[in-house]
Amino acid sequence: MASILLSLNTHTLLPLHTRTRTTKTTLKILRFSHKLPPSSPFYCNHETRLHLRCQTTTGTPSAADFAAAAGQDRLRKVPIKNIRNFCIIAHIDHGKSTLADKLLQMTGTVQKREMKEQFLDNMDLERERGITIKLQAARMRYVYENEGYCLNLIDTPGHVDFSYEVSRSLAACEGALLVVDASQGVEAQTLANVYLALENNLEIIPVLNKIDLPGAEPDRVCKEIEEVIGLDCSNAIHCSAKEGIGITEILNAIVERVPPPRDTAAMPLRALIFDSYYDPYRGVIVYFRVIDGNIKKGDRIYFMASEKDYYADEIGVLSPNQMQVEELYAGEVGYLSASIRSVADARVGDTITHYSRKAEQSLPGYEEATPMVFCGLFPVDADQFSELRDALEKLQLNDAALKFEPETSNAMGFGFRCGFLGLLHMEIVQERLEREYNLSLITTAPSVVYRVHCVDDDIVECSNPSLLPEPGKRRSVEEPFVKIELLTPKDYIGTLMELAQERRGEFKEMKYITENRASITYELPLAEMVGDFFDQLKSRSKGYASMEYTVVGYKESDLIRLDIQINGDPVEPLATIVHKDKAYSVGRALTQKLKELIPRQMFKVPIQACIGAKVIASESLSAIRKDVLAKCYGGDISRKKKLLKKQAAGKKRMKAIGKVDVPQEAFMAVLKLEKEVL
């Protein structure tokens, strides 16, 4: 029997006694108090045994063997009183993903050599933008006061576009870490997610991150949290996720303060889906939290909202990689594979139950994903239309909120009208299409869903400006409004109020949350936000202001359709719906831009902005004049007049039958301008 040393983590060397066999190595981990801190995930009593099978002839376990043993240790069933389900709430760039990385590392869930920044963020796009787009989950094992605990971290996106996914993640937890940057303080989106957490009755643990920064003011931020949110910060944890300060205190607080799940194992199965994604080999993989009952491999399961049933081919836990188990009980978090073909069959927020013993009621809070922002996507190369369709279908397998339908334009050919949750969602989908599928795209100006009340009492929902009914056929038009909350330093209150009023905002209230920061609330049309509102907000506040919005419903507005005509022909992709008061300024800006960009023709080209048959703004592109008199060296004037008359007749005929080709660059520049001026 040989005595060897194995490095368990960054700070511990543990003597191991090994017993060599040809095909089986048994590791007996002994407890050495002076060597191994009690907070370590590998701290255990004398009876603990980790068995692993490996092909070995030397008796010395490899790093892979040890990782396998540690993984099996995390799979061990723990009593429900020792389970803790929690998530992390934070504004963008307040250190949520860094803290999650450090928790995974400190609990030994991920070895240091495997560690990379934003470990739970799998997409390159997430790492580049520094945001979380898709949810992830991780099961960690942590030993506290000689007792093993199972900690389930459910990662959440922080952006307002994904607030529904955040709400379903919170519903799968009993507690939340509220992470606030100690140098910046409370931000608008943090506030919105905290209110969601309070609605779900979660135990909230305040964590002040980035205390190592020179500008950190933890005492001021504590006071701000107490005043703005109303949370007691006397026991707030000060930490630096980057430097690893305060991580042990956070883990201890999760065990001490987050309540365990209710013991409802005897009830019929009810499991909440908080995420799903499409795997090309196994179909849809569903992430879920078991609320009541238990689920076994091979069970016939039923999705209560989609009314579909499947057999659970594989179930397991996320640690953070998928590890198979035979059964999951109430309170546990895991995944399942059931050869599901479409993400639409297993939507976020749906309830899983047994087919033979259905639950009486589904879990509350399920909503269909409703697109709020629409735009047209057209391939620059018409030959890429089928590739664009295939790419959208593949993205939709992973993203049930993405909607699309074919659209045809005289100017840009065949494309798709796509619906998104919000502007960030739209940008992410466009970037993924271009990056992952090598497509070159033209996007039309984003629009929202308008509700049109027609004279025959029909109600039509319209997201495409070119499909808006004629003025004589509609009685009124309604548009979606949002309630927007701006958090800003007091120096920028005036300029941000001016911005909101420029965008048809209706002032609701303003309050000072601290001596130097204010919260301003407005109601304004969603259409006014889908342009450059966020860019203007950051520009006018020098980056210090933040915002959060919620849709409050539809209101009637004085809206009209503004058409652009070139040489008398309407250009459908440039049509837009605007408020009557802004029609002239938008029309003038678009016609002037087109005049700069369209190449001159052999005949005069009028560029007009029209409301119905009425022209409200017009520019003319002067003709290229060919010198037909160049070959005349004098002589009779009638010869020159005849040539000029013939040229004028030709230009008149050309103007009647000629077509003006709007170059691709002009389209892209004007569409960009539309996004800015609307």
From Swiss-Prot:
Gene Ontology CC, one term: chloroplast
EC number: 3.6.5.-
Alphabetized Pfam families for the sequence: EFG_C (PF00679), GTP_EFTU (PF00009), GTP_EFTU_D2 (PF03144), LepA_C (PF06421)
Residues annotated to bind GTP: 90-97, 155-159, 209-212
Substrates-to-products reaction catalysed: GTP + H2O = GDP + phosphate + H(+)
One GO term of the biological process aspect: translation
Enzyme class (EC, first level): hydrolase
Ranges where the tr-type G domain occurs: 81-262
The keyword Plastid is assigned to this record: yes
Chief location of this protein within or outside the cell: plastid
InterPro entries linked: EF-4, EFG_III/V, EFG_V-like, EFTu-like_2, G_TR_CS, GUFP, LepA_C_sf, LepA_CTD
Keywords for this protein: Chloroplast, GTP-binding, Hydrolase, Nucleotide-binding, Plastid, Protein biosynthesis, Transit peptide
Gene Ontology molecular functions: GTP binding; GTPase activity; ribosome binding
Subcellular location(s) per record: Plastid, Chloroplast
Stored SMART domains: EFG_C (SM00838)
Function noted in UniProt: Promotes chloroplast protein synthesis. May act as a fidelity factor of the translation reaction, by catalyzing a one-codon backward translocation of tRNAs on improperly translocated ribosomes.
Record family assignment: Belongs to the TRAFAC class translation factor GTPase superfamily. Classic translation factor GTPase family. LepA subfamily.
HAMAP family per UniProt: GUFP, LepA
Protein name according to UniProt: Translation factor GUF1 homolog, chloroplastic
Organism from which the protein derives: Populus trichocarpa (Western balsam poplar)
